[in-house]
Amino acid sequence: MAVSCLIVDDNHEFLRAARDLLEREGISVIGVASTGAQARRSCRELKPDVALIDIDLGEENGFDIARELAGGEGAAQARVILISTYAEDDFADMIADSPALSFLPKSGLSGAAIRGILRRAGGEP
């Protein structure tokens, strides 16, 4: 069974490229969002196995959205992986304090990396 994924990023070019890459690698990208409101709605409606959330969403904070989605009740709840072009060390304390399963640099984004994180966190769907 393919892992279903929601990608949350305010860069539309990245959304297209990430969707294409992940779908070629066997991840089912069931939705994309560029704002927190879209992410919350998509998470409730689509119920992805995992949400990839950019740390820097312009005026919005990816950490706040991650907390909302990972801590959501019922259908809004999702497992979260934080993504960024920034180095993990730049946000190490904030990442450690977040409910996210892990952090992935955008340059390291792959289907295998996502499946590996989900496996280590308690099972791939």
Please give the residue ranges for each predicted region.
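Two-component/phosphorelay signaling modules centered on CheY-like receiver
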Residues: H12-G31
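Acidic catalytic/metal-coordinating carboxylates
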Residues: T35-Q38, N61-D64
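Short amphipathic alpha-helix used as the core "switch/output" element in two-component signaling
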Residues: F63-A76
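C-terminal output helix
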Residues: D90, S107-L118
